[in-house]
C-alpha cells in the first residue's frame, strides 16, 4: 500500500504548516493542493516544499471537491494506491493517522473514515447540520452505514475513488465529501469507521 496525504487548502496560513509537517512526520508523502488562496499564503506554502511535501496551485478557487479531484489525479500519475485526505484547518486529531493507516492495511478495498467525536466546543449549528446530513445519508443508502458523511479525515482506495470522479457527477465544493462517500457505497466500497475527536477551540 502506497499512500499519499492530500490536503486541500484555501486560506489557512496559520495552520497548514503544522498539518503538513505532522502528516509528513508519519513517513508519508504529502501533497497540498492550493485552491486559489490569497497571496499571503504563498510564502507559507513555498516554505513547506521539500522532498516529501509538494504543492500544486490552482489559479482560481474551484472548491474543496475540485482540489481533491486534482490531488487524486496526481496520486494516480505518481503511482500511489491510496489517498489520505486531511483538512487544512487543524481541527482533525492527526495523532489518529496510524489508526486509519492500520485499518486500511487490513481493509485495502474499503474507504477508512474518521468518525468525529465532538466535545463541548463544537458549535451547535454544526451539530444540527450534521444530523440533517446523517438523515439524508440514510435515505440515500437505506442504511445507517454512513455514520458521518462530512468528515474530511478519510483514506480512499484510489482506483474506485477515481472511477467515481470520472464516471459520475460529483460536486466540486463542500458537497464532494458526502457525495463521493455515498457513490462509493453504491459501488460496494464500504466504509470502515475510526472514532476521532474534533477540536474547534
Segments (PLM) and residue ranges:
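Cell-envelope/extracellular polymer assembly enzymes that use nucleotide-activated donors
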Residues: 2-4, 179
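Short hydrophobic beta-strand elements that form part
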Residues: 4-7, 31, 57
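Short, well-formed alpha-helical segments that are part of the catalytic scaffolds
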Residues: 9-25
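Acidic helix N-cap motif at the loop->helix transition within catalytic regions
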Residues: 14-18, 39-48
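A conserved acidic beta->alpha catalytic loop
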Residues: 34-43, 90
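Acceptor/aglycone-binding surface of glycosyltransferases and processive sugar-polymer synthases
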Residues: 60-62, 66-77, 82, 94-174, ...
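Catalytic donor-sugar/metal-binding loop of nucleotide-sugar-dependent glycosyltransferases
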Residues: 169-172, 181-197
